[in-house]
Each structure stands twice: as C-alpha cells, then as structure tokens.
C-alpha cells in the first residue's frame, strides 16, 4: 500500500497544519505542488523554490533500457520502491547508486537511479506444467493486476491453477503484477470460476 506524501503547511481555509500532496512536478528550479487539506478537503497549488542536483536515470521497459539525465531536489530523500514521475511516466525506483548501492539517499548524494516503467503493461512470464512437460508463455497485464495462489486462470482454451508466485523479495500467496518476477502453474480442467487472462496474451 502506497503512503500518501504529506507536507507541513497551514491550510488557508481551516488552519490545519498538514497537507496531502496530490501531484508534484519539478520544473525550472521550482517545485509545483497540488495539495489537499485532509481536514476540510480544500485543494490548492503552491510553488516552492528548490535546489536541484543532476542524476542519471536508467529506465527499464521490458528488455530495453533508456538513459537520461534528470534534475532532482537536493534535500529530498529517495528510496528503493518509491514511485517517481518523469515527463508524465511513472517509474518505480529499483536501485540507487551514490555511487555505492544504497536503499535510500538524499538527492544531492545520488549519482544514478535505476527504475522500471509503471506506465506500460507488466510483461509476466508463466511456467505451466502439464505433467509431461513444462512450457513458458508471456502475458502483458496492468501493473496493479493481482494474482493469487490456488486461483484458476484461463488463457484462450487452456486453464491452469496458480501454484507459486515469485516476487522481488521471495514468494507470496498474493501479489500485484508490478512486484512479480514469475508465475508457476499446473494445467487443470475447465472450471466455472476462473480469471480470464486471454486479452493479455499476445502469442508469445
């Protein structure tokens, strides 16, 4: 579950001293915030001058990587697992170098940020066992699509029961596509209750 970013700023409407950040954009050495008061619900935009530092960003999109230089606030802390937005694209941070590999760092100390795009479907590999052999296929699903062990899934005319979810941190009984490395299932007979993945299968 993603935590809502908050800043300490007094609401002009009710005086509440903490605001929720709805959107944030860095442009021309200024940070533009769209904030909402959790107390009265009023929304407003604020502008804050910030000191920027340059960092290299490497974005992974399937099997292709793109490298670019970005400006990030010097006093902002970035952590592995955070989601940042660059040129309208949502990117999940997977690695930070200062140049040492660290879990979190201030913008002024960061040299390289590695990330994966969340603005494109997640390419997921599935290993399916039909008793005589195991074969692999790929599907392209929304990043927030959730999979659960022991559920039955359908791809075209085939059905399989999900037996294992391999994630970035190990294994899980339930996980969203963005956190999954691979799925493992066994062929099963057709059932009445299933999740249809056919629209996400491209024949790979």
Curated annotation (Swiss-Prot):
It comes from the Archaea. This is Uncharacterized protein MJ0981.
């Amino acid at each position: 579950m993603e935590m809502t970013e908050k800043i300490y700023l007094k609401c002009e409407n009710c005086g509440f001293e903490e605001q929720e950040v709805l959107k944030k954009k860095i442009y021309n050495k200024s940070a533009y915030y769209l904030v909402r008061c959790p107390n009265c619900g009023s929304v407003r935009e604020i502008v804050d001058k910030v000191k920027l530092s340059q960092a290299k960003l490497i974005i992974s999109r399937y099997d292709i990587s793109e490298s670019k230089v970005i400006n990030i606030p010097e006093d902002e802390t970035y952590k592995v697992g955070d989601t940042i937005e660059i040129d309208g694209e949502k990117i999940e941070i997977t690695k930070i170098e200062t140049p040492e590999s660290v879990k979190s760092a201030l913008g002024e100390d960061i040299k390289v940020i590695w990330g994966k795009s969340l603005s494109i479907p997640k390419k997921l590999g599935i290993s399916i066992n039909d008793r005589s052999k195991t074969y692999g296929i790929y599907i392209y699903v929304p990043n927030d699509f959730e999979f659960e062990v022991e559920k039955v899934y359908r791809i075209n005319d085939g059905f399989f029961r999900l037996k294992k979810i391999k994630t970035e941190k190990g294994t899980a009984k339930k996980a969203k596509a963005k956190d999954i490395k691979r799925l493992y299932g066994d062929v099963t007979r057709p059932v009445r209750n299933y999740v249809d993945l056919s629209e996400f299968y491209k024949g790979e």
